């Protein structure tokens, strides 16, 4: 059975849904069904720093089969992973024990992705998160990135840096510094529209010009709303992200996979929030796709 291919053929792109936009109490099947009913093409799984989410990387075969069964029954894939577990165990941590644990998480995440047919992992762009960065942490970060890229190459899984809310890697240009250092076809950039928009105010550089610095290396894009100085839980359409312009630029750069990133915050009508987000984001993406078709013609 071909899962999710219809959307690619009809629209030329795929729009995924961030897992944390739904209640944590839902089963795998319920999450995939909710995404499908709201009009999304796939779900991006979250592997954050909590013990509960990190435990997913240690799943037994029976648990993995539950996920595969849910994907078969719904016709919706878990198409990518947002791996933010490195906040707690950074790849550049000065503590070798934490650094080793971070690399275990990296290897397990790649193996987990391979087992489920997931081809993309978004990496948090931090050398360290809870500590101050130093030359030592940056050196360790680069060294472990090289190893991680080799692991990804072995598994055929693409790694992409998220542009973050901290100065270490809050722009595509900064992410590209490390992509160019590692020089692996399996390490690219997976930016966040909300974070880029906030960074543009800090540095006085347009979001679109910053995105251009990643030409040929942007593997997917998080579509997230933000307001100056605030990076999370901003409803679509109430912030300052120019989704139409970002979508058009991403399309021009060859990006065809997008994820709507937003959070479930207890709203009883969370399914309505999913549907609204799908409509809102597809308006920008469909316009970008139409612009792309006219440009080619």
What feature does the model see in each segment?
Residues 5, 9-26:
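Boundary/entry segment of secreted carbohydrate-active catalytic domains
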Residues 239, 246, 253, 257-259:
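H/E-rich (His + Asp/Glu) clusters that bind or coordinate divalent metals
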Residues 12-14, 43, 136, 143-240, ...:
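Acidic/histidine-rich catalytic cores of soluble enzymes
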């Amino acid at each position: 059975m071909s899962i999710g291919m219809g959307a690619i053929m009809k629209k030329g792109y795929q729009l995924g849904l961030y897992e944390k936009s739904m209640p944590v109490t839902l089963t795998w099947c319920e999450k995939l069904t909710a995404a499908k009913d709201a009009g999304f093409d796939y779900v991006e799984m979250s592997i954050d720093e909590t013990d509960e989410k990190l435990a997913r990387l240690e799943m037994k075969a029976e648990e993995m089969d539950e996920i595969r069964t849910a994907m078969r029954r719904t016709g919706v894939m878990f198409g990518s992973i947002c791996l933010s577990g490195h906040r707690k165990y950074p790849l550049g941590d000065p503590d070798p024990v934490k650094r080793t644990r971070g690399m275990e998480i990296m290897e397990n995440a790649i193996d987990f992705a391979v087992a489920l047919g997931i081809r993309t992992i978004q990496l948090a762009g931090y050398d360290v998160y809870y500590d101050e960065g130093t030359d030592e942490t940056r050196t360790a970060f680069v060294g472990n990135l090289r190893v991680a890229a080799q692991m990804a190459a072995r598994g055929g899984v693409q790694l992409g840096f998220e542009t973050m809310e901290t100065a270490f890697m809050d722009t595509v240009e900064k992410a590209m510094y490390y992509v160019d250092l590692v020089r692996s076809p399996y390490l690219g950039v997976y930016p966040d529209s909300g974070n880029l928009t906030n960074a543009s105010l800090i540095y006085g550089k347009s979001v679109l010009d910053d995105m251009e610095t990643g030409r040929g290396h942007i593997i997917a894009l998080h579509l997230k709303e933000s307001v100056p100085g605030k990076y999370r839980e901003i409803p679509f359409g109430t912030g300052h992200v120019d989704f139409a312009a970002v979508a058009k630029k991403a399309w021009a750069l060859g990006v065809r996979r997008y994820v709507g990133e937003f959070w479930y915050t207890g709203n009883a009508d969370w399914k309505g929030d999913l549907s609204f987000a799908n409509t809102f984001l597809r308006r920008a993406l469909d316009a970008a796709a139409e612009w792309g078709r006219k440009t080619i013609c």
